[in-house]
Amino acid sequence: TAFSTGAAKANRLAEVYVYDKAAGKIVVPKELFGGQMPDYTKPPAMESGGGGLVSTTMDYARFSQMILNKGELDGVRLLSPASVELMGTNVIPKNVLLNTNGTSGSRFNEAVGFGLDFMVVKDARAAGTLQGDGTMSWGGAAGTWFWVDPTNDVIFVGMVQRLGGTGGDDLGTQARTLTYQALIHPEK
């Protein structure tokens, strides 16, 4: 995981796509958010964790596992349990409602809030999700998303390389449904 790959790893970068409504198909975009497509083989002018990290699915899974382990991975403490707890604690006041999670529509309300860098499920039943209370999640611009569910001891990482999220097929909802249907005893 880094802000650039360097030329030696350029062949490991997956292409990014966008849905072209006029053409009725997925295409390689010529620009990103009104600007030139970034060159991830070169260091960016400004390193922005919210706008330009490149990673592997395995790195993202290890990060998610570290969060599930309350800040520890492979016997090494990377974050304090208190820091991870803060990440999963809602900080949005009751009178503030937002309608996006960055790349797709989402409702922050009494059942779903936002902690330090994560959307947080406060009340799974009220949120209408199969995830457990305390689940932390987020998505990225290119159809990347993850969740960490401490109630059910589950992590999930999805990466589809599509600007605008996972698309109209709502792959995120399908992934959650199939994952939790596969659990023998979801605790919810």
Question: How should each PLM-predicted stretch be described?
Answer:
Residues 22, 150-151:
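Short, ordered coil/turn segments that flank beta-strands lining enzyme active or ligand-binding pockets
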Residues 164-185:
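Generic C-terminus detector
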Residues 132-134, 152:
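Active-site beta-strand/loop architecture of penicillin-binding DD-peptidases
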Residues 55, 144, 148:
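C-terminal substrate/ligand-recognition segments
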Residues 140-142:
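Short, small/polar residue-rich loop motifs at catalytic or cofactor-binding pockets
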Residues 146-147, 153-162:
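Short, well-ordered beta-strand elements
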Residues 1-131:
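Short, surface-exposed loop or secondary-structure junction motifs
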Residues 137:
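Short, structured beta-strand/loop micro-motifs enriched in basic residues and often containing a Trp
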